[in-house]
């Protein structure tokens, strides 16, 4: 059984007991969150597709930790002008553990 949820402007395929890294959420570590924006649920042969969300469906998750991702480098360069600019960025994320998929 799996579901497709929407959070942080992205869609994620989730399975029970799976860890999922999403955009930073305002929640404490150890807190349980319920996502109501379930776009699709697949249970064996049964498929429920929402228009746009599945009515009465939810996904329960537990917040495992908050952290920062890998550093990416942004480089700006103009040839022949002796101009070079480099910047780094680390995106905040929330690590979630999927507890239950309620259809």
UniProtKB/Swiss-Prot annotation:
It holds the Pfam family Ribosomal_L21p. The keyword RNA-binding applies. Keywords: Ribonucleoprotein, Ribosomal protein, RNA-binding, rRNA-binding. GO terms for molecular function: rRNA binding; structural constituent of ribosome. PROSITE patterns: RIBOSOMAL_L21. InterPro entries: bL21-like (IPR028909), bL21-like_sf (IPR036164), Ribosomal_bL21 (IPR001787), Ribosomal_bL21_CS (IPR018258). GO terms for biological process: translation. The keyword Iron does not apply. SUPFAM superfamilies: L21p-like. GO terms for cellular component: cytoplasm; ribonucleoprotein complex; ribosome. NCBIfam families: L21. This protein binds to 23S rRNA in the presence of protein L20. Belongs to the bacterial ribosomal protein bL21 family. Part of the 50S ribosomal subunit. Contacts protein L20. This is Large ribosomal subunit protein bL21. It comes from Psychrobacter arcticus (strain DSM 17307 / VKM B-2377 / 273-4).
């Amino acid at each position: 059984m799996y579901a497709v949820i929407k959070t942080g402007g992205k869609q994620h395929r989730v399975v029970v007991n799976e860890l999922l890294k999403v955009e930073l959420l305002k929640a404490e570590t150890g807190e349980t969150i319920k996502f109501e924006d379930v776009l699709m649920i697949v249970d064996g042969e049964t498929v429920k597709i929402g228009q746009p969300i599945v009515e009465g469906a939810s996904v329960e998750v537990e917040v495992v930790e908050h952290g920062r991702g890998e550093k990416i480098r942004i480089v700006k360069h103009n040839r022949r002008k002796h101009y070079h600019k480099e910047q780094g960025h680390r995106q905040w994320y929330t690590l979630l553990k999927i507890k239950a998929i309620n259809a």
